[in-house]
Amino acid sequence: QNENTSTLNFAGYKRDSYIVNAKTPRFGSGEGKGVLVDSVRGHDLYIMLDVCNYSLEYTVCGFKNHMSPDDHYADLKRVIAAAGGKARRINVIMPFLYESRQHKRTGRESLDCALMLQELTDMGVDNIITFDAHDPRVQNAIPLKGFESVSATYQFIKYLLLGVDDLHIDSDHMMVISPDEGGMGRAVYFANVLGLDMGMFYKRRDYTKIVNGRNPIVAHEFLGSNVEGKDVVIIDDMISSGESMIDVAAELKRRKAKRVFCATTFGLFTNGFKKFDEAYENGVIDRVLTTNLVYQPEELLSKPWYINVDMSKYIALLLSLIHISEPTRRS
């Protein structure tokens, strides 16, 4: 150890842990506050949160309440406010971008994702790092601030090859599928990297009805070449309830696809795992890959059809590059 590191100039730079002691306690009424036990004056502050972690609870007038995305976002703002403008730079790592599905207006609707981005930058946030944003163009709401939407394509390829031994990566044996028109960009990139053909489904909806806030899907129509005898990878940004993913997989099996692999960045499984268990038992799907960027219950990790895609090392490398002001992409 260099003797100079003990001088005042190095105070706060060399430490056993670089994790700031932050707390978000609640009052009995359910109201919260942000507390930073450690000083962040002059430091780069990296705040990481999973807005989809529903396992956390707090008490409201004696009743247990699960943390919603709204609660997590409110706590994020409290922590930023607790810093009091003393941090040198504030960076928010939000793997699942809060309100990312509310990125465009249909009728008299709020633009929640754009509002969130503007609110954070108004509070002094310099950079927002997310993964596979539902529509990266939402960054147009904050054109003068840093916004990174990072792809997990490499990690999907890595863990698919590690988890399945007998894959043949060529256009005669494998194909990439987008489950809807919104995921075309991801599927095109994935297919080009591996040198595969791609196809897509589009959703026929009944625009005369609204069910659970959306026009119900009538059918999934396929556009693409023959999938018979091929392994197919369905690539998307998230599994919400999973019904659309299973419908697409069933349609591919009806067209005599060999095996179906589902690869999505965020596995929310909002309706549980029963339908995926049934799809696996019936041979509709073979494997489901999602990342650890959002909360994963133990039940999910134990499923025979599930492959966990670990992004921890990738995030660490990204933060290291950002901290030393190096580019995250090479031209």
Give the role of each language-model region.
Residues 1-325, 329-331:
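PRPP-associated nucleotide enzymes
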